[in-house]
């Protein structure tokens, strides 16, 4: 599958699929977890508990990578690298 355009990325991120988020452990090694995501206002939101490994890792080092891939063929996927913020629900 070739590179996705912005519309295809938005469509993929709106699907109810499991994504994988990678955070960095204290020693710099990767920690990858399956998560549900929601795309909203140009951001990707992931729900997790405040005491999870990923929350603790993000508090120490906000760099993350999220991969969302649909379970069909050809398999569209997107990888988003950036910085995460841990926040409490409003």
Predicted regions: what is each one?
Residues 25-27, 39:
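Short, acidic, Ser/Thr-enriched surface-loop or helix-capping motifs
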Residues 51-90:
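Short, structured beta-strand-loop surface elements
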Residues 13-25, 64-66:
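A short, Trp-centered hydrophobic/proline-enriched beta-strand micro-motif
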Residues 1-18, 74:
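Extreme N-terminal tail/first-helix region
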């Amino acid at each position: 599958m070739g590179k996705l355009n912005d519309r295809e990325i938005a469509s993929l991120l709106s699907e109810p699929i499991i994504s994988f988020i990678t955070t960095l452990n204290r020693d710099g090694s990767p920690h990858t977890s399956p998560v549900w995501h929601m795309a909203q206002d140009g951001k990707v939101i992931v729900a997790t508990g405040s005491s999870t490994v990923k929350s603790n890792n993000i508090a120490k080092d906000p760099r993350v990578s999220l991969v969302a891939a649909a379970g069909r063929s050809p398999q569209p996927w997107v990888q988003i690298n950036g910085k995460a913020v841990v926040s409490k629900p409003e």
